[in-house]
Amino acid sequence: MTTTIDIPRIFTISESEHRIHNPFTAEKYATLGRVLRLQAGAQILDLGSGSGEMLCTWARDHAIGGLGIDMSPLFTAQAKQRAAALGVSDRVTFLHSDAAGYAAERQYDVAACIGATWIAGGVAGTVAQLALSLKPGGMLLIGEPWWRKVPATEEEARACGVSAVADLLPLPALVASFGELGYDIVEMVLADREGWDRYEAAKWLTMRRWLQAHPDDEFAVEVRAELNAAPLRHVTYTREYFGWGVFALMQK
């Protein structure tokens, strides 16, 4: 029996109405696309592409092309629908696959992993993986959380939803780490608390409506538990402790 590659079901449910699966807003992605000075015809590889909003809107606004890979069948289908809706299906392609270890057969002008650096065990591994698919002189995009406020204890870190304080860095240390990997940061765009609100709070209505529509589903207990806990966790921890941003890198 073959098992379909997928993300945990709680995310498939809670983020099923999201176009963007991170704390960026449409405006932040528009800003990022503008400040990167993308050239028409540039080709972008996006590992962990979610519902494809970055590639689709940049294809519309900047005439880029590209490939997005995501392990969620639902999000991949949504990305294809979004490309069709924006009239860019001829420029961008979306594949349902595991991005871990993926190395493209061709080289890209931009190689991105926005909020999914777990695919290669963290930032350093993801930078190394993306570099395999990058043209000489090309640009990497890394989307990564960082500590806005460093937890005082390991218990506090776990309450934030990470396993240890060491899982994330404060922003200055994260920025320094890119240099230590041999890269210049050539641009960055940071999320704000409004972006976190849009990412997290949008899940609550989705979960509530799912519960109303699926009261007898065996997964309803887990969704109910998440809905009970999520709002207070967000305003107590996520909103206060986490920063997030996309960093553009070029090899020194």
What does each of the following model-derived ranges do?
Residues 53-100:
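Class I SAM-dependent methyltransferase SAM/SAH-binding core
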Residues 124-139:
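A short glycine-rich, Lys/Arg-flanked "PGG" loop and its adjoining helix->strand segment in the class I
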Residues 189-252:
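Conserved Class I S-adenosyl-L-methionine
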Residues 48-52:
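Class I SAM-dependent methyltransferase "Motif I" SAM/SAH-binding loop
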Residues 145-165:
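Short, glycine-/aromatic-enriched active-site segment of Class I SAM-dependent methyltransferases
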Residues 101-111:
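A short acidic, Gly/Pro-enriched loop at the edge of an enzyme's catalytic core
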Residues 110-123:
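A short SAM/SAH-binding and catalytic strip from SAM-dependent methyltransferases
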Residues 22-40:
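Conserved alpha-helix/loop element of class I SAM-dependent methyltransferases that forms part
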